[in-house]
Amino acid sequence: SVWGGLSAVAWTDVVQVVILILGGILMTGIALTYVTPDGGIISGLSHVYNTVPERFSMILEKGEIITPDGRDAYFDLPGIAVLIGGMWIANTYYWGFNQYIIQRTLAAKSLAEGQKGIAFAAFLKLIIPVIVVLPGIIAYVMNLDDTGVLTAASVDPGFIYSDGSFANDNAAPWLIRNFIPAGVKGLILAALAAAIVSSLASMLNSTSTIFTMDIYKSHFNKSASDAKMVTVGRITVVVALLIAILIAPQLEG
């Protein structure tokens, strides 16, 4: 981000997204084979769904709340209407107004290429539940007691903070540590690192662009040359990164 700008971010993302998708799918597949004594991905997925079907519902389950007039609240807000209604607002913002989505699209060599890139990125988003959400549900199922309840006694010690609260963010590291073969752990860890680095690089580059174009050039130096703006952009990246390092520990949890 500092020296290569958007071009460097784009090319590193190409490599990182391949590692992220392959590593995530591999981790999920291996975890599914261990979640049931029968083994197998399909059997594991069926076991997870049958054990905690409520974890596969967004906000409401069918039949969970019945309104006074006898209607199933699942078909009203919040429920399925969220998927066909409210979520479009959030997604219109993300794909149409998010700065680092826009800058990548505008950097395409043509309108057609930009449209293809957005469509492909949207397709990759559909894989996220498989490589992010599902491993968490698998870890949850593996730590239930015999009655199907998550308790401090049934949970692996790696999921308990010193204050006694559950460390939900430890699901992926726990799966990697306990179930991923030694030769594959490196790839999975690289996938997790790729997810962090990819997002960080994009956000830093976006921060640099916004500050340089919308603040520095617009209000402080309207006649700034391209070379000057590149320098300011690089300084902005470094400063933003230092600020992030300082405040990140305060945002834990």
Put a short name on every predicted segment.
Residues 1-253:
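Membrane-embedded helix-loop-helix hairpins and adjacent transmembrane boundary segments
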